[in-house]
């Protein structure tokens, strides 16, 4: 439907706006939004862009393409090489991680591996301008957090290596005595063991309890009175 200038002069602004939208016109002169244009300028722009019969088909196609580009920019789209609109990708999907050293490698300590991840993280944040969780390396933040919580800084590692040992190292005699103190009778769980069962070689009971049992508590082997030998542990 063709609209003359006189016809559009009699229309309300809302009706003119609907006409412009139907022709995909959202901006007027100098990319000014149609909602902010004066009515007379609004009518002139619509009349020149769409309703003038002198426009050739190529001119009309150009007008529609410009309108499509305006709509695309408004929706965050961009024109592609084939003329169609494509949504802009805010992340670079062609990321290739060429090398990340293994934390178990002999050439890289866990601390240097952590520093490498930090440097890579910083460079990637600059390249993408967004959080890592939205990109292909979404787990990198998790790895860095784990390393930060379990690894020591260089200064802390140096202090730990240079810290003097203030404890005591037990001797063999002390360890043996402590072991004897903890070996208790398997029957009463109170007295120290002091009886050797000669056949099975088990030392597992105290003197009073060995008189009341007829088999070894460990291997269940029959123990005669002649097989019970009292020993004295140091």
From Swiss-Prot:
Q: Where are the zinc fingers (RING-type)?
A: 185-220
Disordered: annotated span: 65-89
Keywords noted in UniProt: Metal-binding, Zinc, Zinc-finger
- Keyword Zinc-finger set for record: yes
Query: InterPro entries from the entry?
Result: Znf_RING, Znf_RING/FYVE/PHD
Which Gene Ontology molecular-function terms are recorded? zinc ion binding
Zinc-finger as a keyword?
yes
Q: Which Pfam families match?
A: zf-C3HC4_3 (PF13920)
Question: What is stated as this protein's family in its record?
Answer: Belongs to the IIV-6 175R/332L family.
What protein name is recorded for this chain?
A: Uncharacterized RING finger protein 332L
């Amino acid at each position: 439907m063709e609209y003359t200038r006189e016809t559009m002069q009699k229309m309300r602004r809302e009706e003119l706006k609907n006409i412009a939208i139907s022709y995909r016109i959202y901006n007027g002169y100098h990319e000014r939004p149609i909602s902010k244009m004066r009515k007379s300028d609004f009518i002139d722009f619509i009349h020149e862009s769409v309703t003038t019969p002198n426009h050739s088909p190529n001119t009309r196609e150009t007008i529609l393409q410009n309108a499509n580009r305006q709509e695309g920019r408004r929706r965050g789209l961009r024109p592609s090489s084939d003329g169609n609109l494509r949504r802009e990708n805010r992340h670079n999907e062609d990321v290739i991680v060429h090398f990340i050293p293994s934390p178990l490698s002999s050439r890289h300590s866990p601390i240097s591996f952590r520093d490498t991840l930090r440097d890579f993280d910083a460079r990637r944040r600059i390249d993408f301008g967004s959080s890592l969780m939205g990109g292909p390396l979404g787990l990198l933040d998790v790895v860095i957090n784990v390393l930060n919580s379990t690894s020591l800084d260089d200064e802390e590692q140096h202090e730990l290596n240079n810290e003097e040992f203030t404890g005591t190292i037990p001797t063999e005699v002390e360890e043996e005595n402590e072991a004897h103190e903890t070996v208790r009778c398997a029957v009463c769980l109170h007295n120290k063991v002091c009886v050797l069962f000669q056949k099975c070689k088990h030392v597992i009971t105290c003197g009073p309890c060995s008189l009341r049992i007829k088999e070894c508590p460990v291997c269940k082997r029959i123990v005669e009175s002649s097989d019970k030998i009292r020993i004295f542990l140091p």
